Amino acid sequence: AINFIRAKGDVKTVNILDSTSDAFDIDFSHININQVEIRNAKNDCLDLSYGNYLINKINIKNCGDKGISVGEKSNAVFKEVKINHSNIAIAVKDTSFAKVENSEIFHSPICFAAYRKKQEFAGAKIKILQTNCKNEQLFVQKGSKIDLEI
């Protein structure tokens, strides 16, 4: 597992295999990552909070909970996403925004979820530009929004 806290900068490549908790956790940071590969996490594969994030390419498989979790007033942009085997592929919550430009999601009951988890925050918003997911694989709580442009 890797955890960045209050980090700023660019990362070329991250590879994580067999994590017993969240595989990659980034908090209070401003990070641009070119490529992320994660396999086999007991909890979330990628967990982002309180920051601004750009991920160019992410390929994740076998996430115990969420493939990607964006929360606590974060802004995140994902250019190319592949997620295989997660409960929720991409969850955005608690006054956060995520833009997902190109996603392929397989074996995940919920592709995208936008909601408020913690009382002190508002809902969340996801903008999806291209995906193989269907509308019935979306979860949107009142006060949150998902814009789907296929």
Where are these predicted regions, by residue range?
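Extracellular beta-rich repeat passengers
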Residues: 1-150
